[in-house]
C-alpha cells in the first residue's frame, strides 16, 4: 500500500526529514517498507501558461502554439492535443528544444497524465490559476510503499492519519487532526437506518446531502489519489476514496433519488437474491452475505462494493453518504465467496474502529463544501450502533517491562512513548503504569501487557537492545525410551541400505480387501481427505505393498521400511495405537531367499534370542514361506514372502514386528562380558534336508546337540543342485566353540562335532562333514 509523503507531512507540520530517511525509520519502528516511488517529477518545472495563438502545421496533425509562460517568457511549442486553443490556461514544461513536425518546439504543453496528476491522456490539462505560477495544489511527491502483510494487525495504519501518528511518535513531533466533529449536524436524520444483527454491523452512520454538483475533482484531489494508486472518477466518489485513504474509514455514496423508501436496511441477503455491482458483475447471494438494502432490495454488498442501481452519476443532485463498520469475518467471507477484494474490503477485514464512522462523516462534510460548492446538509446524522465497552486498563509494571526488554528504561521515557502513541497512562502505584488502549488499537491489536512491551521496544529501537544469551538452567530432558528405541531401529535399517517411507494412516476399501482384512473392525473416518482414504489403518502392510508395487515398475531391486502406528478399535475410549516396523526386500530376479535371510538377520540384530518358527500362511502370504518371530515364547512378528498374486514380477520378502513387544522383551541391563583370554575354534557342518525344511529348524536342532561349549551357530549358505538328489538341499552352518577357562583340545572339539552328527542322524538327517 502506498503512502504519500506530502499527505503525511500535512498531519506532522514539523516533519523535515526527507522521504528516504523517513522510510528507513518506518521500517525499523513500524512496518516494512518496500521502496519509494517519485510522483509528479514534471511538476518541479511546470508552470501555468496561456496559449496565445495556434497555427496548423502542414501535413501534420500537430499545431504550432505560442504561449505566454509568465516569467519564463513567450515560447513556441508544438502540440498535438485536440483541446489546444487560444486563451486556454495550461501547464508548460521547459524540457528543452526539439524539432517536431519540422518545427522547433521549445518545451511542451503537458496533459494530466504526463504531470502525474491523473490518468487523462486525451488533452492538455486546463487550469484556472495565475500565470507563471506552479500548478496549484500539486507539488512533487514521494509514495512510500508499505508491505501489506506487515500491517494486517494494525487497522489504523491503513490510512494516512494513522501512519502520520506513528511518524509523529517516532520523531517526537505534534500530530494534527483534520476531522472536525463539531461539523456534524444535530437534529432528526433525513434517513433511517435499521440493523438486523449488530454483531455483523456494529455501527452504521449516514448523512443526506442535497444541491450536489457532480463534476471532475479539483486537480489537487485527483493528484492526491493518483499518487497512491487510486483512480479519480468524480468529485463525490473521489471524496469517499480520499476519506478512506486518510482515516482508513471506507465510505460509500448512494444517489438518494434512486433509493426506494426512507430506510436503509442492513441485513443478511435472502437466498438467491440478485445483485448487480458497480463493476457490472452480477451476483447471486445467500444469507452468509451481508447487504445494504432499501425497500426494493440489495443496493450494496456490505464492506465490499456498491450496487449499480444506486450509483452516483452526472445527474445526481441528492446523496446518501454511508460511513459504517462491519464485522471483519463477515466481509472476508463475502469477499472470498464472490472472488472480489476491494480497497474497502481489505480495510474492513482488519477490524476497523467503530468510532471512526462519524469521524469519516465529519471529514467528508468539510471536503464536500470545498469541492461541491452550494451543497447542503439535510437533517442530522443517522447513527445506529452497538454499545462497545471500553477495554479495561492494562497494568504494566516497570520492572517487568525492563526484564522483558532486556535493558533499563526510565519511567518518564515509557510514559512519553505510550502517550505519543495516544495511550492513556497513569501511575496509581509507584513503578506500575495503568495504560488505557485507544479504540483504534483495541479491536485486534493491543490487549495484554506483552503487547505494550512491543510498543515500547520498537520505539526505543530494537537495535538499542544489546544481545544477551538467555540465562536458563541447563538440564538433560527426561528420556523417552520408546522414541530412543525406534530411533535405534531406524538407524539399523538405514545403515543396512533400507529407505524409509512415510504413508498416510488411512486405507482404502480396495487395499483392505486385497489382504482379506475385515473393514468392519476398522475405524471409519467421517470426513476423509480423499475417497480412497476412509479407513484408519490396522496394519502397515497395505501401505508398504503399494510402495513395493509402484517402485517395482522402475527398479530391479530395493529395500524399504516404515515405522508407524497400527490403529485398532477399542470397545470404549480412544483407539489402541501400536508402534510397528514393516520392512520389504524386493528383487525382480532370483528365488527370493536372500531377502528372507537378510530380514531374518536384521531381526536377530534387534533380538539376539529370537527364533523363527514355521507358521501357517495367511491368504496374502506365500504358501511355503511364512514364519513367526518369537522371543521367550512370545510372538513378536512375522517373516514372510508376499503371495505371487500381489506382486506381478519378482519376489518381495516382508518383516512385520510389534515394536512395543520387541522393546519390552529385549529391554534389560546390558551386561559386560570380558574379552575371552582363550581362543575359540570353529568348524562347518552341512545338513542334507528336504527343500521345505526351514533353516531355523535345522539350526535349533544343531544347537540342542552342541552342548555347553558352543558359543554361536550361524547360517552360512544353502545349495541346491548336482550332485544332490532332486528335492534335497544342503544347508551349511558354522559352529564356534570355546571355554572362558582354557583352550579346548582337539579331542573336545571332535567330541562336540560327533555329538552333533550323531544327534542329527538320530533325527533322520544326513550330514556332509
Curated annotation (Swiss-Prot):
Subcellular location: Cytoplasm
Cofactor: Mg(2+)
InterPro entries, per database record: aa-tRNA-synth_II/BPL/LPL (IPR045864), B3/B4_tRNA-bd (IPR005146), DNA-bd_dom_put_sf (IPR009061), Fdx_antiC-bd (IPR005121), Fdx_antiC-bd_sf (IPR036690), NA-bd_OB-fold (IPR012340), Phe-tRNA-ligase_IIc_bsu (IPR045060), Phe-tRNA-ligase_IIc_bsu_bact (IPR004532)
Catalytically driven reaction(s): tRNA(Phe) + L-phenylalanine + ATP = L-phenylalanyl-tRNA(Phe) + AMP + diphosphate + H(+)
A Pfam family: tRNA_bind
GO CC annotation: phenylalanine-tRNA ligase complex
Residues annotated for Mg(2+) binding in this entry: 445, 451, 454-455
Domain tRNA-binding: start-end pairs: 40-141
Example GO molecular function: ATP binding
PROSITE patterns associated with the record: B5, FDX_ACB, TRBD
Cofactor note: Binds 2 magnesium ions per tetramer.
SUPFAM superfamilies: Anticodon-binding domain of PheRS, Class II aaRS and biotin synthetases, Nucleic acid-binding proteins, PheT/TilS domain, Putative DNA-binding domain
Keywords per UniProt: Aminoacyl-tRNA synthetase, ATP-binding, Cytoplasm, Ligase, Magnesium, Metal-binding, Nucleotide-binding, Protein biosynthesis, RNA-binding, tRNA-binding
Gene Ontology BP annotations: phenylalanyl-tRNA aminoacylation
Location of the FDX-ACB domain: 676-768
EC number(s) recorded for this UniProt protein: 6.1.1.20
Residue stretches making up the B5 domain: 389-467
PANTHER family in UniProt: PHENYLALANINE--TRNA LIGASE BETA SUBUNIT, PHENYLALANYL-TRNA SYNTHETASE BETA CHAIN AND LEUCINE-RICH REPEAT-CONTAINING PROTEIN 47
Family the entry assigns: Belongs to the phenylalanyl-tRNA synthetase beta subunit family. Type 1 subfamily.
Quaternary state and interactors: Tetramer of two alpha and two beta subunits.
Protein name: Phenylalanine--tRNA ligase beta subunit
Organism lineage string: Bacteria, Pseudomonadati, Acidobacteriota, Terriglobia, Bryobacterales
Gene: pheT
Amino acid at each position: 500500500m502506498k503512502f504519500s509523503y506530502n499527505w503525511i507531512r500535512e498531519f506532522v507540520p514539523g516533519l523535515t526529514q526527507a522521504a528516504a530517511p523517513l522510510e528507513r525509520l518506518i521500517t525499523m519502528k513500524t512496518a516494512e517498507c518496500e521502496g519509494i516511488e517519485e510522483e509528479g517529477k514534471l511538476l518541479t518545472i511546470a508552470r501555468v501558461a496561456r496559449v496565445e495563438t495556434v497555427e496548423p502545421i502542414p501535413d501534420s496533425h500537430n499545431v504550432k502554439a505560442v504561449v505566454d509562460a509568465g516569467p519564463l517568457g513567450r515560447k513556441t511549442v508544438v502540440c498535438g492535443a485536440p483541446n489546444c486553443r487560444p486563451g486556454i490556461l495550461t501547464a508548460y514544461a521547459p524540457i528543452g528544444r526539439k524539432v517536431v513536425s519540422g518545427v522547433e518546439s521549445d518545451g511542451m504543453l503537458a496533459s494530466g497524465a504526463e504531470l502525474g496528476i491523473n490518468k487523462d491522456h486525451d488533452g492538455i490539462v486546463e487550469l484556472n490559476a495565475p500565470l507563471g505560477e506552479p500548478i496549484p495544489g500539486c507539488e512533487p511527491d514521494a509514495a512510500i510503499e508499505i508491505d501489506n502483510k506487515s500491517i494486517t494487525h494494525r487497522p489504523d495504519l491503513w490510512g494516512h492519519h494513522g501512519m502520520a501518528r506513528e511518524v509523529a511518535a517516532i520523531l517526537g513531533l505534534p500530530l494534527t487532526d483534520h476531522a472536525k466533529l463539531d461539523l456534524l449536524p444535530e437534529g432528526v436524520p433525513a434517513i433511517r437506518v435499521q440493523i438486523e444483527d449488530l454483531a455483523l454491523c456494529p455501527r452504521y452512520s449516514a448523512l443526506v446531502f442535497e444541491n450536489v454538483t457532480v463534476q471532475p475533482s479539483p486537480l489537487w484531489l485527483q493528484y492526491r489519489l493518483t499518487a497512491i494508486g487510486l483512480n479519480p472518477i468524480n468529485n463525490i466518489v473521489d471524496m469517499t476514496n480520499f476519506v478512506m485513504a486518510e482515516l482508513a474509514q471506507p465510505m460509500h455514496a448512494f444517489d438518494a433519488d434512486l433509493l426506494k423508501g426512507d430506510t436503509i436496511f442492513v441485513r443478511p441477503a435472502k437466498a438467491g437474491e440478485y445483485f448487480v455491482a458497480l463493476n457490472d458483475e452480477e451476483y447471486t447471494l445467500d444469507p452468509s452475505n451481508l447487504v445494504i438494502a432499501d425497500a426494493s432490495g440489495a443496493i450494496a454488498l456490505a464492506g465490499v462494493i456498491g450496487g449499480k442501481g444506486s450509483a452516483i452519476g452526472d445527474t445526481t443532485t441528492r446523496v446518501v453518504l454511508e460511513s459504517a463498520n462491519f464485522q471483519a469475518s463477515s466481509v472476508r467471507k463475502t469477499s472470498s465467496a464472490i472472488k472480489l477484494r476491494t480497497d474497502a474490503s481489505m480495510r474492513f477485514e482488519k477490524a476497523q474502529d467503530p468510532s471512526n464512522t462519524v469521524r469519516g462523516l465529519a471529514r467528508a462534510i468539510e471536503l464536500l463544501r470545498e469541492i461541491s460548492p452550494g451543497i447542503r446538509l439535510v437533517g442530522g446524522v443517522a447513527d445506529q450502533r452497538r454499545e462497545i465497552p471500553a477495554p479495561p486498563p492494562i497494568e504494566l509494571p516497570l520492572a517487568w517491562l525492563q526484564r522483558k526488554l532486556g535493558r533499563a528504561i526510565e519511567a518518564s521515557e515509557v510514559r512519553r512513548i505510550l502517550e505519543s502513541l495516544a495511550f492513556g497512562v497513569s501511575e496509581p502505584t509507584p513503578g506500575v503504569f495503568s495504560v488505557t488502549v485507544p479504540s483504534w488499537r483495541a479491536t485486534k491489536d493491543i490487549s495484554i501487557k506483552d503487547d505494550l512491551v512491543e510498543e515500547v521496544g520498537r520505539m526505543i529501537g530494537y537495535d538499542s537492545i544489546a544481545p544477551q544469551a538467555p540465562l536458563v538452567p541447563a538440564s538433560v530432558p527426561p528420556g523417552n525410551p520408546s522414541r530412543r528405541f525406534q530411533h535405534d531401529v531406524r538407524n539399523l535399517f538405514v545403515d543396512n541400505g533400507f529407505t524409509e517411507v512415510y504413508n498416510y494412516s488411512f486405507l482404502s476399501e480396495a487395499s483392505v480387501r486385497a489382504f482379506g482384512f475385515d473393514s468392519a473392525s476398522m475405524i471409519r473416518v467421517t470426513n476423509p481427505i480423499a475417497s480412497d482414504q476412509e479407513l484408519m489403518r490396522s496394519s502397515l502392510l497395505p501401505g508398504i505393498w503399494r510402495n513395493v508395487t509402484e517402485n517395482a515398475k522402475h527398479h530391479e531391486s530395493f529395500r524399504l521400511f516404515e515405522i508407524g502406528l497400527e490403529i485398532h478399535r477399542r470397545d470404549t475410549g480412544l483407539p489402541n495405537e501400536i508402534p510397528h516396523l514393516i520392512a520389504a526386500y524386493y528383487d525382480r530376479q532370483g528365488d527370493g531367499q536372500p531377502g528372507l535371510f537378510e530380514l531374518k538377520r536384521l531381526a536377530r540384530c534387534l533380538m539376539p534370542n529370537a527364533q523363527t518358527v514355521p507358521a501357517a500362511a495367511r491368504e496374502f502370504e506365500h504358501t511355503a514361506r511364512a514364519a513367526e518371530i518369537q522371543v521367550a515364547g512370545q510372538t513378536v512378528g512375522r517373516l514372510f514372502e508376499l503371495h505371487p498374486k500381489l506382486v506381478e514380477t519378482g519376489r518381495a520378502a516382508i518383516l512385520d514386528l510389534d515394536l512395543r513387544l520387541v522393546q519390552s522383551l529385549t529391554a534389560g541391563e546390558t551386561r559386560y562380558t570380558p574379552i575371552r583370554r582363550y581362543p575359540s575354534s570353529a568348524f562347518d557342518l552341512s545338513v542334507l534336508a528336504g527343500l521345505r525344511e526351514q533353516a531355523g529348524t535345522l539350526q535349533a536342532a544343531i544347537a540342542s546337540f552342541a552342548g555347553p561349549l558352543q558359543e554361536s551357530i550361524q547360517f552360512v549358505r544353502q545349495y541346491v543342485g548336482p550332485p544332490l538328489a532332486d528335492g534335497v538341499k544342503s544347508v551349511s552352518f558354522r559352529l564356534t566353540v570355546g571355554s572362558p577357562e582354557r583352550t579346548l583340545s582337539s579331542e573336545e572339539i571332535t567330541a562336540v562335532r560327533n555329538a552333533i552328527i550323531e544327534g542329527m542322524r538320530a533325527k533322520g538327517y544326513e550330514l556332509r562333514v
